[in-house]
């Protein structure tokens, strides 16, 4: 039997310790006998609106540095727990949307082009398409923006319609002004998908904080601060 593959989970994060504990426990159970899990927790410092896309980009760069550019990765919200049948480590396309059956949406997609929740890919593919735009602050729009870039790139994309996730309850902070700015940026991206900045660590400092490796799971934490 060959060595188990490495899988990197990239978690955009702030003030969700209880969810992170549940997620880590589930991934440890889910991975047994199938793959070696590496969880990259990209924690945004307090002070600025949350930037999920930028945090995921920063995590991609860390996986690329530590595990290599062809490592399977999951761009993964911390509040989504996978069913045992979810497959993270075998990718039939450059981008595979996994969160198609999520409990909070009654196991349906909330809209036709939904590309949120959990996406499996590799650092190489993310860097090739330019990653998420770096300019989506606050809630909403960055997943749709990534899908625009994937479609424009010519790389392959698939959806798996039998991958189930349980979503954990949480409060979402929505800033109406930022939401409208994000919608305006998304409309500009429909004309030019590369508006809004490509994957980069420019404008951020990223510092590794106390992490954990115990032979079964690797959990690496990084404090990400806008500059």
Regions found by a protein language model. Give the residues of each.
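Short, acidic, metal-binding catalytic loop of nucleotide-sugar glycosyltransferases
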Residues: 2-4, 12, 16, 22-36
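Cell-envelope/extracellular polymer assembly enzymes that use nucleotide-activated donors
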Residues: 5-8, 38, 145
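Active-site-proximal specificity loops/subdomain of glycosyltransferases
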Residues: 21-24, 33-70, 105-106
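Short beta-strand-to-loop acidic/aromatic patch adjacent to the donor-nucleotide binding site
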Residues: 68-83
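Conserved donor-nucleotide/metal-binding helix-loop-beta segment in metal-dependent transferases, i.e.
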Residues: 83-107
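A recurrent flexible, glycine/aromatic-enriched loop bordering the glycosyltransferase active site
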Residues: 103-121, 128
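A conserved catalytic-core signature of glycosyltransferases
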Residues: 114-122, 133-134, 140-141
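C-terminal catalytic/acceptor-binding lobe
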Residues: 135-138, 144-227
């Amino acid at each position: 039997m060959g060595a188990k593959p490495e899988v990197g989970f990239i978690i955009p994060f702030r003030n969700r310790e209880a969810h992170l504990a549940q997620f880590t426990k589930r991934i440890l159970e889910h991975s047994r006998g199938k793959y070696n899990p590496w969880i990259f927790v990209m924690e945004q410092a307090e002070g600025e609106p949350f930037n999920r896309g930028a945090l995921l980009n920063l995590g991609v760069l860390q996986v690329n540095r530590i595990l290599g550019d062809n490592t399977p990765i999951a761009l993964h919200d911390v509040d989504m727990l996978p069913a045992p049948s979810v497959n993270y480590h075998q990718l039939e396309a450059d981008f595979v949307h996994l969160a198609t059956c999520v409990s909070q949406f009654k196991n349906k997609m909330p809209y036709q082009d939904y590309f949120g929740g959990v996406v499996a890919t590799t650092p190489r593919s993310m860097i090739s398409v330019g990653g998420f735009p770096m300019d989506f602050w606050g809630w909403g729009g960055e997943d749709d923006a990534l899908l625009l870039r994937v479609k424009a790139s010519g790389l392959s994309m698939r959806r798996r319609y039998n991958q189930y996730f349980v979503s954990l309850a949480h409060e979402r902070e929505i800033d109406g002004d930022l939401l409208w700015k994000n919608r305006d940026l998304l409309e500009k991206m429909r004309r030019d998908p590369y508006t809004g900045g490509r994957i980069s660590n420019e404008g951020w400092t990223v510092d590794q904080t106390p992490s954990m490796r115990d032979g079964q799971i690797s959990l690496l934490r990084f404090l990400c601060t806008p500059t």
